[in-house]
């Protein structure tokens, strides 16, 4: 179990940590005190969830979406006015169980493999369909250069 957890943690984009600290640094330098405090709270929630994830294999959709909201808030600060998230999940689905951190690789891949600019903002939607489907949909604007990756995040998600 511990080795599986360590493998999962290694798959979370290591640049996320550094980008988060750079985002925090930018907010501090800009004197954005209120935004800095919100950002710190979001960062704290993200890391708390990740650290506590070694004790769970399944979580409710509600728990996973709370994590996603904190994570996407951090991304939103980094990609201000270029990245938009929409979550529309019916209350009846919130108790459904899914593997912990299962939405993260889908969001990371959308960000990693698409152009994100003011002219072409990335839109990611998470919603439910009446036939028990959870849908993660994003606008597709592939980057011109191929992003090198090994597909480990999606492979891990399929295995879980």
Sequence positions of predicted segments:
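Two-component histidine phosphotransfer core
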Residues: 1-159
């Amino acid at each position: 179990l511990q080795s599986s957890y360590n493998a999962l943690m290694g798959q979370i984009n290591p640049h996320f940590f550094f980008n988060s600290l750079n985002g925090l640094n930018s907010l501090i330098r800009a004197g954005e005190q209120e935004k800095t405090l919100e950002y710190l709270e979001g960062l704290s929630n993200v890391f708390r969830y990740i650290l506590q994830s070694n004790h769970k294999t399944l979580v409710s959709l509600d728990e996973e979406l709370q994590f996603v909201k904190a994570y996407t808030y951090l991304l939103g600060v980094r990609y201000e006015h270029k990245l938009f998230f929409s979550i529309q999940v019916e209350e009846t689905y919130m108790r459904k169980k899914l593997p912990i951190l299962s939405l993260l690789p889908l969001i990371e891949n959308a960000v990693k493999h698409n152009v994100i600019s003011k002219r072409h903002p990335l839109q990611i939607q998470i919603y439910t369909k009446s036939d028990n489907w959870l849908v993660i949909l994003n606008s597709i604007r592939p980057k011109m250069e191929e992003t090198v990756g090994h597909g480990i995040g999606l492979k891990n998600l399929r295995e879980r």
